[in-house]
Amino acid sequence: MNIPFRVGQGFDVHALVEGRPLIIGGVTIAHTHGLLGHSDADVLLHAVTDALLGGAGLGDIGRHFPDTDPAYRGADSRVLLRAAFDKVRAAGWAPVNVDATIHAQAPKIGPHAAAMVANIAADLALDAGAVNIKAKTNEGLGYLGRKEGIAANVVVLLARAG
């Protein structure tokens, strides 16, 4: 069966720690803590990358950019996203739209959302109107509410490239 569309879903979470920059959606945000990870720990772009790869049936971010590989230590997640985008296009798929939710008690994401949208749209060759970013607090509940981490959920619609 030749289905013209696929949906990819991505999720990522990273702990907040002192001494690291906070980078979300390719935007460096002034904050007391940053996200812990092997790369730049961009929770949003990691979830977008997973959604793209998963929708195309290409596995996940860890398969293509393993955290055991020193080549990816401190890696810019926009570079990883663009590499994943190239793999998805080579497999015959193109993103149609991206819908993302960032879960963070702090900092406020709203002032940075437009820049995040612009970065993702540029990296995926989409119009900015095809990328949506929402932000939610956890109402003080759980590890997110205690400001111990930040998470992101992403859904991507892919169409057969033609």
Curated annotation (Swiss-Prot):
Its EC number is 4.6.1.12. Pathway: Isoprenoid biosynthesis; isopentenyl diphosphate biosynthesis via DXP pathway; isopentenyl diphosphate from 1-deoxy-D-xylulose 5-phosphate: step 4/6. It comes from the Bacteria. Gene3D superfamilies: 2-C-methyl-D-erythritol 2,4-cyclodiphosphate synthase (3.30.1330.50). GO terms for biological process: isopentenyl diphosphate biosynthetic process, methylerythritol 4-phosphate pathway; terpenoid biosynthetic process. It comes from Bordetella pertussis (strain Tohama I / ATCC BAA-589 / NCTC 13251). Homotrimer. Belongs to the IspF family. One of its GO terms (molecular function) is 2-C-methyl-D-erythritol 2,4-cyclodiphosphate synthase activity. The record marks 38, 137 as: Transition state stabilizer. Its cofactor is a divalent metal cation. 4-CDP-2-C-methyl-D-erythritol 2-phosphate binds at residues 12-14, 38-39, 60-62, 65-69, 146. Pfam families: YgbB. A divalent metal cation binds at residues 12, 14, 46. The gene is ispF. This is 2-C-methyl-D-erythritol 2,4-cyclodiphosphate synthase. Binds 1 divalent metal cation per subunit. It catalyses: 4-CDP-2-C-methyl-D-erythritol 2-phosphate = 2-C-methyl-D-erythritol 2,4-cyclic diphosphate + CMP. InterPro entries: MECDP_synthase (IPR003526), MECDP_synthase_CS (IPR020555), MECDP_synthase_sf (IPR036571). Involved in the biosynthesis of isopentenyl diphosphate (IPP) and dimethylallyl diphosphate (DMAPP), two major building blocks of isoprenoid compounds. Catalyzes the conversion of 4-diphosphocytidyl-2-C-methyl-D-erythritol 2-phosphate (CDP-ME2P) to 2-C-methyl-D-erythritol 2,4-cyclodiphosphate (ME-CPP) with a corresponding release of cytidine 5-monophosphate (CMP). Keywords: Isoprene biosynthesis, Lyase, Metal-binding.
